[in-house]
Amino acid sequence: MVVRRKKKSPKKYRGSRTHGGGSHKNRRGAGNRGGRGMAGSHKHKWFHVIKYMPDHFGKRGFNRPPKVVREPNTINVGELDALADKLLEDGIAEKDGDKIVIDVTDERLKPYGGPFDKVLGGGHVKRPLVVVAPEFTERAVEKLEEAGGEAREA
């Protein structure tokens, strides 16, 4: 058995006029390759499709209508902590002893990007806040409780 010890060098077609394309007339137009791109994929290139792109044709699943898909409006606990004094001034938040109560579902939060559906755990909480919201992340609840506040589900 012959063992090739030296790696075969790739053929660069130096000095060749047509680089393996047959006659110089053959490379003209798209007829030489059976059409451009995906042309003929439902006809003469069908075997290529079923071998290399088996899922290319046909429908699978469905797309939900955009008006049904609703991304939750979120805010970080750090942002609430930073806004707390301003919200107290505007009468959106209330003081309950040493705690500040903020209802993030309040329509009056529109100038601040609200009302919010979910409270996330980003940022630092330096004072006790009682936050009322439909949803919280675990980290948000941890941070609020560490600062002496609480998370209330709306």
Swiss-Prot record:
Residues 1-30 have a biased composition (Basic residues). The keyword Ribonucleoprotein applies. GO terms for molecular function: rRNA binding; structural constituent of ribosome. The keyword Ribonucleoprotein applies. Keywords: Ribonucleoprotein, Ribosomal protein, RNA-binding, rRNA-binding. One of its GO terms (cellular component) is cytosolic large ribosomal subunit. Gene3D superfamilies: 3.100.10.10, 4.10.990.10. One of its GO terms (biological process) is translation. InterPro entries: Rbsml_uL15_N, Ribosomal_uL15, Ribosomal_uL15/eL18, Ribosomal_uL15/eL18_sf, Ribosomal_uL15_CS. Part of the 50S ribosomal subunit. Belongs to the universal ribosomal protein uL15 family. Binds to the 23S rRNA. This is Large ribosomal subunit protein uL15. It comes from Methanopyrus kandleri (strain AV19 / DSM 6324 / JCM 9639 / NBRC 100938).
